[in-house]
C-alpha cells in the first residue's frame, strides 16, 4: 500500500471519528433538554398508546404491518414445505417477534407528562401549537390536533388536568 492509501484511510477514519463525536454530542443535548422538560411537568400519569391515540392508532398499525404480514404469510404457506428448515425457523421467529413488538406498542403503559410547552407522550413531544382545542367526551379529554400536524390525543379525565389544559387550549 502506498502513502496515498494510508493518508486516505487516515482521513476517512478521522472524519468518521468527528461524525461520531457530533452524533454523541447531539444525543447528549437531546437527553439534557428532555430532562429539563420532564422536570417542569405539571401533571403526570400512566396510560397505554391504545388509549391515548384511540382506535385509529391501532387500525393504522394494523393496516401498516398486519396486512402485509398476513399476505406474505399466506403466500409463504403455499410454499412452506419447499422452504429450507433454517429459513422457516427464522421466518417464524421473526413474525412472532414482530407481532409481540406491535402488541408492545399498543398495550405497554407510558408516562404522559403535561408540561408548560406541550404534552410529552411516550417518546413524542407535541407542543400546544399542534392542537386546535379540546373537548370532553366519554370521560376523556380529547386534544384535537391541527389537520396534517398532529392527531387527536385522548387523555383520562381529571379536574386537575382539565384546569391545566384550559390555560393553554380553548374548549371546542
From Swiss-Prot:
Tree of life domain: Archaea
Compartments, as annotated in UniProt: Cell membrane
GO annotation, cellular component aspect: plasma membrane
Membrane protein topology class: Multi-pass membrane protein
Main location, first listed in the record: membrane
Keyword entries, A-Z: Cell membrane, Membrane, Transmembrane, Transmembrane helix
Key word Cell membrane present: yes
Transmembrane segments: 7-27, 59-79, 89-109
InterPro entries assigned to the protein according to its UniProt record, in alphabetical order: DUF5673 (IPR043730)
Family: To M.jannaschii MJ0695.
Protein name (Swiss-Prot/TrEMBL): Uncharacterized protein MJ0803
Amino acid at each position: 500500500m502506498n502513502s496515498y492509501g494510508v493518508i486516505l484511510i487516515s482521513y476517512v477514519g478521522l472524519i468518521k471519528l468527528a461524525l461520531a463525536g457530533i452524533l454523541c454530542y447531539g444525543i447528549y443535548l437531546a437527553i439534557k433538554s428532555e430532562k429539563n422538560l420532564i422536570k417542569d411537568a405539571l401533571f403526570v400519569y400512566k396510560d397505554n398508546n391504545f388509549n391515548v391515540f384511540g382506535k385509529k392508532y391501532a387500525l393504522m398499525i394494523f393496516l401498516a404491518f398486519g396486512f402485509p404480514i398476513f399476505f406474505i404469510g399466506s403466500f409463504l404457506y403455499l410454499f412452506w414445505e419447499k422452504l429450507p428448515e433454517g429459513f422457516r425457523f427464522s421466518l417464524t421467529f421473526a413474525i412472532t417477534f414482530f407481532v409481540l413488538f406491535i402488541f408492545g406498542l399498543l398495550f405497554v403503559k407510558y408516562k404522559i407528562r403535561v408540561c408548560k410547552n406541550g404534552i410529552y407522550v411516550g417518546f413524542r413531544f407535541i407542543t400546544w401549537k399542534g392542537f386546535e382545542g379540546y373537548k370532553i367526551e366519554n370521560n376523556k379529554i380529547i386534544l384535537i390536533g391541527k389537520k396534517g400536524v398532529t392527531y387527536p390525543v385522548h387523555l383520562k379525565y381529571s379536574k386537575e388536568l382539565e384546569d391545566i389544559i384550559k390555560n393553554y387550549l380553548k374548549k371546542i
